[in-house]
Amino acid sequence: MNIANARVLVTGGSSGIGRATALALAEAGARVAICGRNRAAVEQAAGEIGGTPFVADVSDEASVVKLIPDVVRTLGGYDVLINNAGFGRFAPLIDTTADDMRAVWETNVLGATLVARESARHFIAQSSGNIINVSSTSGARGSANGSAYSSSKFALTSLTECWRAELRKHNIRVMQINPSEVLTDFAYRARGTERVTDPSKLLGSDIADAIIAMLAQNDRAMVTEMTVWATNPQ
């Protein structure tokens, strides 16, 4: 697709991979909307990247049902969903609570589904569209303390395949990107560790570059899934 002038929504676009992707898309000429729950953070990020801010909670159905028509109206159309909003909690199985499971799945599974559903309704009507789900290498291989997060990303991979099977007949590309560890505030908050500078680890911009490459394929071609690993993490 031609990214210049594409109309794009990035969920969870105020920080981390979402912000880096929104910035890269805007620099490539796309018209970008970002959404998040924190008004101040979303408005600040949108101002810095030249995008349009929307305050929305992807796990709240009414919020999402309102969001997509607002994006379509504001951008003058809608071509691409970067389904990026995510949440993580990490704990040993014996310490994992029902609230941990609900909180992670409400954003990573329910939220992703609600935004994809409302976006798909618009894309089907226009017989074109793109959905990129931002998953994780944790969705391909479980790890200690990852019961809530890894299971949600395994679920997202299944959802990606279901949606692709349903939507490709409408000329809608459903794709998934699986980042390995990325130096973002999300990663540090989720694991309760201090932010460090490590040039061997991935940055949000590395994932943004991969997403741009996936979208830039001719519309007749679809990169169904891409996994991005650090070459030699220390």
Task: Locate the predicted segments by residue.
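Conserved glycine-rich cofactor-binding loop
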Residues: 14-15
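Conserved glycine-rich Rossmann-like NAD(P)H-binding loop of the short-chain dehydrogenase/reductase
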Residues: 30-43
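The beta1-alpha1 cofactor-binding region of Rossmann-like NAD(H)/NADP(H)-dependent oxidoreductases
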Residues: 56-67, 98
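Substrate-binding pocket helix/loop in short-chain dehydrogenase/reductase
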Residues: 92-93, 100-102
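Active-site helix of classical SDR
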Residues: 116, 152
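Residue(s) in the substrate-gating loop at a strand-loop-helix junction
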Residues: 136
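C-terminal helical subdomain
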Residues: 169, 176-177, 194-234
